[in-house]
Amino acid sequence: MLTSLLLATVLQAEAIGGYTAGCLKNAMALPLEGPGYQVIRTKRLRYYGHPDLIHYLQTLANQTRMAGLPDLYIADLAMAHGGPFTTGHRSHQTGLDADIWFRMANRPISKWEQDAPKEWALIDEPSYKMLPGRFGPQQLTLLRLAASKPEVARIFVNPVIKSAVCQQAGDEPWVAKLRPWVGHFSHFHVRLRCPAGSPDCEQQAPIPPGNGCGAELASWLKDKPQLPKVSSINKMPVLPSRCRN
């Protein structure tokens, strides 16, 4: 933690703008492997983040390791200067978002597997039901550790996964941070709050009161939510002036 804080101070790391229209100043790269985790899809060069995010991920990986879980697979963070991706996510622009797979690593992976890892969906898309044996104690522990940290603003999960958590741990306060969203069949998406020293970072609206296990979740499960059209995902956002200079 001290190293991250010192680097953030010396380099004046900043998250600028909003999660879906912003950039990142003086990012840190997450080492491609470390205690309790491995970075995947490294050819995308999306393993940069604000120092707070790097510290969060390394701390989480240490905690999951101590809890007896296999290594985490960490996927997209942000690009070196943040900003919009050319493909995929609309967010991940300010170095405060990270994708973590529910599938975990029981062994070091090869370079080929690192670049093209096999996805492990928890949900059968046609039926929109949980696949048997895919969401167990390890996945619940991972979500509990990931969501319990105060710097976490919210975690996006598939509504079916949120429902499973509500059934098993609905009375625990961290469950409120799990927000249902489309997709996310094989991973969850952590989003941190705006960090200190980033005056131009735009906070997202607070999550609603309650654990989110009631009528709101039921509305997501009533009809299978549809993914946004590709054209709307890839539309270039209007970036803050500091991101255009």
Q: Predicted regions span which residues?
A:
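A residue-level signal for beta-strand positions that form part of recognition/binding surfaces
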Residues: 4, 71, 97, 154, ...
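Glycine-centered flexibility motif
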Residues: 17-24, 28-29, 83, 95, ...
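Catalytic cores and adjacent binding grooves of peptidoglycan-active enzymes
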Residues: 114-245
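Acidic/His-rich structured neighborhood in mature extracellular/periplasmic domains
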Residues: 79-132, 190
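Hydrophobic alpha-helical targeting segments used for export or membrane insertion
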Residues: 3-12
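Extracellular/periplasmic catalytic domains that process cell-envelope and extracellular macromolecules
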Residues: 65-67, 91-96, 147-148, 181-184
